[in-house]
């Protein structure tokens, strides 16, 4: 994965970009497996960025599974649309996208993979995003995201874990993926 668009957007975007470098193969494998992408009929990726996870999702998803990428950065949306012309990307914030209308057409969402920088968001935005997407998860569906190790101890990290736990039936964490830069772990929340 080319780092140039990723780094450029990190420095010039007026909205938070989730990482300075793309996720490692180990973190991507952990996230995609935890989300159950290989058996999902409908997959939503929040904040696909430059497409680091998108390629792994594309390789793992069943033939015919619906995919939607919701990205707030218009430059990255254009890059993604050019790289993955068969996938559907929208230029929108995750708090503003109409998931109800999307699900009316495509059915409930089986897997949500989020690359959003949750610890960069205040409590209000965290809750608005979660309240906009989580009600549209299928029963037994998974919401999967990751956090850099140590960031979960920050105030916004603690608030995010609490908000997720209040809205989901079950929340678990993976072991730390030390090979990622920086090291990270995965939240796996089940509806």
Predicted regions: what is each one?
Residues 3-38:
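Class I SAM-dependent methyltransferase Rossmann-like catalytic core
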Residues 39-49:
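Conserved class I S-adenosyl-L-methionine
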Residues 51-55:
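Glycine-rich SAM-binding Motif I of class I
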Residues 73, 95:
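Conserved SAM/SAH-binding beta-strand->alpha-helix loop
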Residues 80-81:
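Conserved SAM-binding loop
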Residues 127-139:
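A short glycine-rich, Lys/Arg-flanked "PGG" loop and its adjoining helix->strand segment in the class I
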Residues 137-147:
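Conserved beta-strand signature within the Rossmann-like core of class I S-adenosyl-L-methionine
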Residues 155-191:
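Class I S-adenosyl-L-methionine
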């Amino acid at each position: 994965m080319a780092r140039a668009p990723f780094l450029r957007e990190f420095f010039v975007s007026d909205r938070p970009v989730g990482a300075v470098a793309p996720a490692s193969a180990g973190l991507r494998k952990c996230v995609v497996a935890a989300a159950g992408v290989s058996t999902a009929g409908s997959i939503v990726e929040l904040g696909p960025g430059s497409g680091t996870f998108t390629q792994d999702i594309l390789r793992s998803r069943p033939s015919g599974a619906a995919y939607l990428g919701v990205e707030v950065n218009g430059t990255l949306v254009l890059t993604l649309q050019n790289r993955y012309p068969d996938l559907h990307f929208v230029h929108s914030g995750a708090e503003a996208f109409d998931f109800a209308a999307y699900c009316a057409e495509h059915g409930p969402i089986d897997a949500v993979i989020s690359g959003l920088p949750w610890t960069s968001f205040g409590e209000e935005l965290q809750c608005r995003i979660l309240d906009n997407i989580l009600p549209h998860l299928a029963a037994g569906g998974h919401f999967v995201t990751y956090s850099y190790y140590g960031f979960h101890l920050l105030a916004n990290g603690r608030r995010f874990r609490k908000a997720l736990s209040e809205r989901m039936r079950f929340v678990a964490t993976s072991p730390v993926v030390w090979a990622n830069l920086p090291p990270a772990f995965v939240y796996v929340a089940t509806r």
